[in-house]
Amino acid sequence: MERVERENGCFHTFCPIASVAWLHRKIKDSFFLIVGTHTCAHFIQTALDVMVYAHSRFGFAVLEESDLVSASPTEELGKVVQQVVDEWHPKVIFVLSTCSVDILKMDLEVSCKDLSTRFGFPVLPASTSGIDRSFTQGEDAVLHALLPFVPKEAPAVEPVEEKKPRWFSFGKESEKEKAEPARNLVLIGAVTDSTIQQLQWELKQLGLPKVDVFPDGDIRKMPVINEQTVVVPLQPYLNDTLATIRRERRAKVLSTVFPIGPDGTARFLEAICLEFGLDTSRIKEKEAQAWRDLEPQLQILRGKKIMFLGDNLLELPLARFLTSCDVQVVEAGTPYIHSKDLQQELELLKERDVRIVESPDFTKQLQRMQEYKPDLVVAGLGICNPLEAMGFTTAWSIEFTFAQIHGFVNAIDLIKLFTKPLLKRQALMEHGWAEAGWLE
């Protein structure tokens, strides 16, 4: 990993509890209960204000001073859970812990076990503390909490056999042939239903009619994962979930690039086809067509210099996609790199001579920005406005988290997230805002 540098800087990232924004819509009949301080509640109300007023399936249990001296949070938490049950009637409740819970050493796991027994349905703890996790790793914590509900074996079904005598059997019944257990494919990641349907359709056209997804919208219909399962991650930040699947289920986790951009989607599909012995000849034409559809946007991006400061752990796949667009990625900063799950992405970026910085130091990045003079900086929300004031054009990294960016069909939405800020800056300059001092 000679091209990966580490600077041990602080994470400039959203809090992991914000992952409820997409998870509460993915897992039906669920409720996400966040346990934290007034500051955490204010963050959720500010960041997800539209969803809060839409009466979404998440809420807050605010820690008070009396909770600091309480022997156990079970009783107080139980009162909040009862309110949730009365109003929402969920089939599963996820209790998301925050930094405050970690600092106070509150044992929510024991409380959740007691509450699961009391209410008769799963109350699952998930560690979403921002102390050692980045924004998107909240999804990893929730999926990891769901793994015990993933079956190891499919429900037994009695086969209906039609007995027919074989030729030259002389009336003797032949011995039953033992069939090898079939391998199944499971895609892992909480992406939108339309994205899943597109990927399932692509794989069906290539010869895989059945493709399961984890998480399923219904907790009672999770796919089987065992030693016969091939697991393929859709997101680069599911490390704990994948490690547990390898260790406890003995499933094969396919190491490939992520289906982000036409190039990534093509390699993703090819890796699955090769694993299952399927023909890959049709994939190249699909990729070529996707690139042709992007040509107007590619003309805007070619030759531009783009820098990632690091926020949502999508930086490496996005940087790989941009290099395929003839963009010079001057630096790909990211909070954390799990080399085992990102092996293919790292190899491609090294081949393309992209500087990769793990846990970057923001002060040093500011100095490098002055040297690079990038055309676009991809950064977290809290950093973008100050950078704009310094004369840099920025893109919000959070937009890549919420947008549909996987697969061939969504490639146009992905590339527009990069071209839109560039076009905005160009329009401002054409209207004379640069002369007024708004832009340098």
Curated annotation (Swiss-Prot):
Biological process terms in GO annotation: light-independent bacteriochlorophyll biosynthetic process; photosynthesis, dark reaction
Q: Which cofactor does it need?
A: [4Fe-4S] cluster
Q: Can you state which reaction this protein catalyses?
A: chlorophyllide a + oxidized 2[4Fe-4S]-[ferredoxin] + 2 ADP + 2 phosphate = protochlorophyllide a + reduced 2[4Fe-4S]-[ferredoxin] + 2 ATP + 2 H2O
In its UniProt record, a GO molecular function of this protein is: ATP binding
Keywords, A to Z, come to:
4Fe-4S, ATP-binding, Bacteriochlorophyll biosynthesis, Chlorophyll biosynthesis, Iron, Iron-sulfur, Metal-binding, Nucleotide-binding, Oxidoreductase, Photosynthesis
* One Pfam family per UniProt: Oxidored_nitro
EC top class, in one word?
Answer: oxidoreductase
What are the TM regions of this chain, as residue ranges? none
Cofactor-binding details, from the entry: Binds 1 [4Fe-4S] cluster per heterodimer. The cluster is bound at the heterodimer interface by residues from both subunits.
Q: Do you know which InterPro entries this protein is assigned to?
A: LIPOR_BchN/ChlN, Nase/OxRdtase_comp1, Protochl_reductN
Functional note: Component of the dark-operative protochlorophyllide reductase (DPOR) that uses Mg-ATP and reduced ferredoxin to reduce ring D of protochlorophyllide (Pchlide) to form chlorophyllide a (Chlide). This reaction is light-independent. The NB-protein (BchN-BchB) is the catalytic component of the complex.
Subunit and interaction comment: Protochlorophyllide reductase is composed of three subunits; BchL, BchN and BchB. Forms a heterotetramer of two BchB and two BchN subunits.
The protein here is known as Light-independent protochlorophyllide reductase subunit N
To which species is this protein native? Heliobacterium mobile
